[in-house]
């Protein structure tokens, strides 16, 4: 069974939806609500489902996106916007929709 372009786009979008949503919301929350310096990484993960930036940018799905020319700088910029936005969830939706647009209209 072959995968056509539309199915591949849907697969990529599903990966993006799952990975980006939780990460950006956690990242935005942490920037708005700093954690005490003595909190352990394990506590951060348990409490906020948060992965540090190094792990995030080394992740397989991130590499997959960059293979499609969605750059580190672009994603980092959108994360910064989301974190500083009054309503991070709305900003995250914009970010996710922008990736969908790129995948559907410019990349495949």
What kind of feature is each model-predicted range?
Residues 78-105:
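Charge-dense polyanion-binding interfaces
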Residues 12-13, 34, 67, 72, ...:
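Low-complexity, intrinsically disordered short peptide segments enriched in small/polar/basic residues
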Residues 39-88:
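Acidic, low-complexity, intrinsically disordered interaction modules
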Residues 2-34:
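N-terminal acidic leader/helix
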Residues 1, 104-108:
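Short intrinsically disordered terminal tails
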Residues 7, 21, 26-27, 40, ...:
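Terminal low-complexity, poorly structured segments
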């Amino acid at each position: 069974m072959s995968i056509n372009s539309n199915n591949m786009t849907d697969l990529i979008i599903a990966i993006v939806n799952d990975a980006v949503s939780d990460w950006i919301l956690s990242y935005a929350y942490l920037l708005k609500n700093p954690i005490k310096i003595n909190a352990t990484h394990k506590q951060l993960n348990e409490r906020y489902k948060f992965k540090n930036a190094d792990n995030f940018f080394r992740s397989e799905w991130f590499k997959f996106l960059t293979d499609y020319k969605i750059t580190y700088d672009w994603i980092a910029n959108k994360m910064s916007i989301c974190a500083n936005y009054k309503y991070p969830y709305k900003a995250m939706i914009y970010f996710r929709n922008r990736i969908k647009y790129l995948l559907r209209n410019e990349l495949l």
